[in-house]
Structures are given as C-alpha cells and as structure tokens.
A protein has these predicted regions:
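Short loop/turn segments that connect beta-strands within beta-propeller blades
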Residues: 6-10, 48-54, 95-100
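Structural motif
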Residues: 1-4, 40-47, 87-93
Length: 122
C-alpha cells in the first residue's frame, strides 16, 4: 500500500488507486514504478499521477523488454531502470520523457540507483 502524509496535519491516507509496486521513483507529481515478482513472466512498468490519483499506462512506449528490473530512478524528466540477475553485471536502461530508450549501458553487479550530479557555476 502506498501512503501519503499531509505535511501540515501529518494525516496519513492511502493512495488506493496506486498499483502494486516492487520499486518506485518520484518526480514532478508522478510515480514511476515497476512490479516484478519471482516467477512472473514479465514485469509491469507503470505510472501513477499523484495529483489526480490515477494509474497510467507503461512509461516504456517503444517495446523495450526488461526481464529482471532491480531499481528505478527518475531524474530530469528521464527514467532510469537498472536490471540485474544477481550474478552477472547489470544494465541501466535510460528512457526519455517520451518513453523511448535513448541509452543502455553496463553498470556492474546489482546496480542500485542512478544519481546525476549537476555542474554548478564553479
């Protein structure tokens, strides 16, 4: 169950329309999530609009197949999904705001998170 905490009243409410998620990332009012359980034939990749509290369709729009998602990050309008089988080097899949894969690269064993650093005016 995904829950929301009101920062003024500290009231906790459940987001009842939010689909099940193994992992999720948040950016700009939207949850990007995947649901992958052992033995599933294929994982589900979905969005959830936190303002309207409605579930959306897959954020992957180009048919890219990811069999063993491990983690997810949303940064700068892009979504990054790490894939791992727990014994070989994993991959990072980079999707643009249009849901299309724009880059895939190897990232070592069990990649946990994508963090992008911004170069400030140094």
């Amino acid at each position: 169950t995904v829950q929301k905490i009101n920062t003024e009243t500290y009231e906790v409410t459940s987001l009842t329309n939010c689909p099940n998620a193994t992992e999720m990332a948040y950016e700009d009012g939207k949850l990007f999530l995947f649901y992958a359980q052992w033995g599933m034939s294929s994982p589900a990749f979905l969005t959830f609009d936190t303002k309207s509290q409605s579930a959306g369709t897959s954020f992957i729009t180009d048919g890219t197949s990811i069999q063993s998602p491990y983690s997810i990050s949303a940064v700068g309008g892009n979504v990054y999904v790490a894939e791992s089988d727990y014994k070989n080097n994993g991959d990072i899949y980079c999707f643009g705001g249009d849901g299309k894969l724009f880059k895939k690269f190897e990232a070592g064993l069990n990649p946990m998170k994508v963090v992008l650093a911004q170069k400030d005016n140094i």
